[in-house]
Amino acid sequence: NLVQFTYLIQCANSGKRASYHYADYGCYCGAGGSGTPVDELDRCCKIHDNCYGEAEKMGCYPKLTMYNYYCGTQSPTCDDKTGCQRYVCACDLEAAKCFARSPYNNKNYNIDTSKRCK
C-alpha cells in the first residue's frame, strides 16, 4: 500500500532522502501523470504508475494492498509468494530501487505540470 511504499523508498535509499520528496516530482511522481517524463527519476514514477495499472487490471487494489517485505542491509525484498500482495510489493520495490539509483533534480520538484507535462 502507499504507506508501505514510503517505507520501501526509505529502505532502498538508506534514509538519504525522505519519501515526501517524491510525492510532487516531475510529471508522474504523485497523483496523476501525463506527458513525457522530465528525467530518469520521473520515468521510475511512470513505470510505477503503469505497474499499478496492471495490478488493477488483475483485480488488485495496489494503493490499499498490504504486503510483507524485509528491509535488509543490502536492499529491501518482498516476502509474499503469491497474488496481489506479491505483485504490488514488486511494483513498489522496483520503483523504490529505481528512485535510489536515479539522480534527484530539485528543479523538477513541484513543477508547473500544465506547462511541462504535455
UniProtKB/Swiss-Prot annotation:
Q: Does the keyword Lipid metabolism apply?
A: yes
- Please provide one cellular component term from the Gene Ontology annotations of this protein: extracellular region
What remark does the entry make about the cofactor? Binds 1 Ca(2+) ion.
Q: Cellular location of this protein? A: Secreted
Keywords in alphabetical order: Calcium, Disulfide bond, Hydrolase, Lipid degradation, Lipid metabolism, Metal-binding, Secreted
Entry-linked InterPro entries: PLipase_A2 (IPR001211), PLipase_A2_Asp_AS (IPR033112), PLipase_A2_dom (IPR016090), PLipase_A2_dom_sf (IPR036444), PLipase_A2_His_AS (IPR033113)
> Do you know which PROSITE patterns this protein is assigned to?
PA2_ASP, PA2_HIS
Q: Cofactor(s) for this protein?
A: Ca(2+)
The record's GO molecular-function terms, alphabetically, read: calcium ion binding; calcium-dependent phospholipase A2 activity; phospholipid binding
Q: Which residues are the active-site ones?
A: 48, 92
Quote the record's binding site residues for Ca(2+): 28, 30, 32, 49
Reaction catalysed by this enzyme: a 1,2-diacyl-sn-glycero-3-phosphocholine + H2O = a 1-acyl-sn-glycero-3-phosphocholine + a fatty acid + H(+)
A GO BP entry is: arachidonate secretion
| A Pfam family per the record | Phospholip_A2_1
Q: List the disulfide bonds.
A: 11-71, 27-117, 29-45, 44-98, 51-91, 60-84, 78-89
Location (main, coarse): secreted
Give the function comment from the record.
Answer: PLA2 catalyzes the calcium-dependent hydrolysis of the 2-acyl groups in 3-sn-phosphoglycerides.
Its quaternary organisation is: Monomer.
Task: Please identify the protein, giving its name as recorded.
Answer: Basic phospholipase A2 3
**Biological source species:** Laticauda semifasciata
